[in-house]
A protein has these predicted regions:
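Amphipathic alpha-helical substructures
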Residues: 10, 73, 78-81, 226, ...
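Alpha-helical protein-protein interaction scaffolds
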Residues: 1-103, 526-529
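Canonical tetratricopeptide repeat
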Residues: 32, 66, 100, 386, ...
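Juxtacatalytic substrate-recognition/specificity segment
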Residues: 2, 14, 21, 109-228, ...
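A structural motif in tetratricopeptide-repeat
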Residues: 23, 57, 91, 377, ...
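Beta/coil-rich, acidic/histidine-enriched accessory regions frequently appended to metallopeptidases
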Residues: 1, 14, 18, 29, ...
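Register position in tetratricopeptide repeats
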Residues: 5, 39, 73, 106-107, ...
Length: 563
């Protein structure tokens, strides 16, 4: 096992022969080798070793189960389902095989859309809502990233969306668990939670899909031989290249962790950043730091040298050796990268005082103590945040607005829910200053991909004013979080129609028809109006459907008279 991750195939073969010396047909040897390879995402090699184990003992159950999982991760689903069925016949109590049987039945009801470049599988209800958008985004990613990283994908990429987290877990991990995971890539197979699942509205499924497809590219380039930090770092970096609001920008938490020597992982040890993480916060920081390392390498040494690192990884080199061979000594890079990270952290809110008060700075029994502290420390973020809380409690909106403005001056890069921008929005809304509120909301919307409440508020404010381009932009941002949200789909439909984009408006109304049967009469009527100039038969069909649900609709009856 120790020899597996070296490039010397001869040593690996010698170690295997030594393990088989006492028992030449011991299936456990190849099963163990394959299992370790599978953990390193080298599924094709793992499958070969599981087949060797089964040649030694055709009934060796651990090899059958592992081969089943490897086949699923290679996209060979038909063979995997058959093998899982055979395992159930041999061992009716095998939990993994039982769960795979349940998953197979569930996925039999999925819709499968096959194209030369992609195969998409998802619950039937999902395809009309976001299927075309997923395909469009995948093709955009492939057109951009494949030539950038110098690869031509020879086979279609399989992308599967799961409506239930438990189904996603069984398909992805072989067992229940993995809560919080949005998507996983195995090479040319991607599994994702549906944007209509429990995570809807909290995570940007479009950025997640872009992230996972980037893994398809980099894992293919390196033949699945790359450390997690580099793979994740490239994916997060490419998210930021696609949309500056994606890809984990610097925030107050990352700033604090970067400036903490115990939290910041040295460049040469990034391979351990994910393994040593003890909390969700530390895992997220590992993603962030990895993406910054990738950004540093690309900006400092250029695309061609970076591609050389990936080629060397595919040949079996260790990551630090590959970086040294293509760039310079890792120890030198480590020193400069540390300075790069520190300078970036210090630049975030550089004018602000990030220190919290000491116990002796405040007297909890003296109400004037806090006011005096704020006067002495006018740039203290802690004091300004508390002052904002007091203003909200007292409904002192002008004071809240002023405090928000001060926070924006101190930390203009912060667009979080507690930022100065958010405080100003709250104050302006209460003061009924809509146009000023819109200006502030748009600044947040342009920089925060997960700000669903902000996007919805902008739709609410721009729609009555018939600012259709803005309505369209914000509705698209909402559907990147939750395409099943009716408000956003109706906004898309109305905005496209107003902008003289009938085809797009028709598609949006068709999604509304799926999502909201209670207003089907009105939706069919709108579709009839949109189809009439180009397809009278479809228009008439929708009109009749509308009138069957609302026979007293005078506009509909008048329209029918003119057919």
């Amino acid at each position: 096992v120790a020899q597996l991750f070296h490039a010397d195939a001869k040593k690996v073969a010698e170690a295997r022969d030594q393990a088989l010396k006492r028992w030449a047909k011991n299936p456990a040897v190849d099963h163990l080798i394959g299992r370790c390879l599978s953990r390193a995402y080298r599924f094709a090699e793992s499958a070969l070793h599981q087949r060797k184990a089964l040649e030694f003992d055709a009934q060796y159950l651990p090899a059958k189960v592992q081969l089943c999982h490897d086949l699923l991760r290679l996209g060979e689903e038909e063979e995997a389902w058959k093998l899982a069925g055979a395992i159930r016949e041999d061992d009716g109590y095998n939990i993994q095989a039982h769960n795979l049987g349940l998953l197979e039945k569930e996925m039999d009801g999925y819709v499968t859309k096959s194209f030369p470049d992609f195969i998409l599988k998802m619950p039937k209800r999902d395809w009309p809502i976001y299927g075309e958008r997923a395909l469009q985004l995948l093709r955009e990613a492939k057109a951009l990233l494949a030539p950038k990283y110098g690869i031509d994908l020879k086979r279609p990429v399989l992308v599967e969306f799961f409506g239930e987290q438990s189904d996603f877990a069984i398909r992805t991990f072989g067992a229940l668990g993995g809560q919080g995971m949005l998507g996983v890539c195995f090479g040319t197979v991607v599994t994702m939670n549906s944007p209509g699942s429990l995570a809807n509205g909290r995570n940007n499924w479009e950025s997640t899909l872009w992230h996972e497809f980037c893994h398809v590219i980099t894992l293919s380039v390196t033949q699945n031989r790359m450390p997690r930090w580099l793979s994740e770092g490239i994916s997060v970096y490419e998210e930021r290249q696609r949309d500056s609001a994606w890809g984990m920008p610097m925030d107050a938490t990352f700033r604090e962790m970067t400036l903490n020597e115990e939290k910041l992982t040295p460049f040469s040890q990034l391979s351990g950043a994910f393994m040593k993480a003890k909390s969700q916060e530390e895992i997220l920081f590992a993603y962030y730091e990895s993406s910054q390392a990738v950004e540093y390498l690309l900006d400092t040494y250029g695309k061609h040298k970076f591609q050389g690192i990936l080629r060397d990884l595919a040949a079996g080199k260790r990551v630090n050796d590959a970086i040294t061979a293509n760039c310079e000594n890792v120890d030198e890079i480590e020193k400069r990268f540390s300075s790069f990270m520190t300078n970036k952290a210090k630049a975030f809110g550089a004018k602000a005082d990030w220190n919290k008060p000491k116990p002796e700075d405040l007297n909890p029994f003296d109400e004037s103590s806090f006011s005096e502290f704020l006067k002495k420390h006018p740039t203290s973020l802690w004091a300004l945040q508390r002052h904002a809380e007091d203003a909200i409690k007292n409904k002192n909106w002008p004071e809240l607005l002023q405090t928000g403005q001060k926070l924006v001056e101190l930390v203009p890069e912060d667009f979080s829910g507690t930022s100065g921008y958010s405080l100003q929005v709250q104050a302006l809304r209460q003061m009924k200053r809509e146009e000023d509120e819109i200006v502030m909301l748009r600044r947040i919307a342009a920089n925060a991909s997960g700000a669903q409440s902000t996007f919805l508020r902008l739709i609410e404010l721009d729609w009555p004013k018939k600012r259709w381009s803005e309505v369209l932009t914000h509705a698209r941002r909402v559907t990147a979080l939750n395409p099943f949200l009716l408000t956003a789909q109706k906004a898309l439909a109305e905005a496209h129609a107003a902008l003289n984009q009938p085809t797009e408006s028709i598609h949006a109304w068709e999604r509304v028809l799926v999502l909201d049967q209670s207003s089907a009469a009105q939706t069919h009527f709108r579709l009839a109006q949109l189809w009439k100039p180009t397809n009278a038969a479809k228009a008439r069909r929708h009109l009749l459907d509308s009138l069957s649900l609302a026979p007293r609709n005078r506009e509909g009856l008048e329209m029918l008279r003119h057919f």
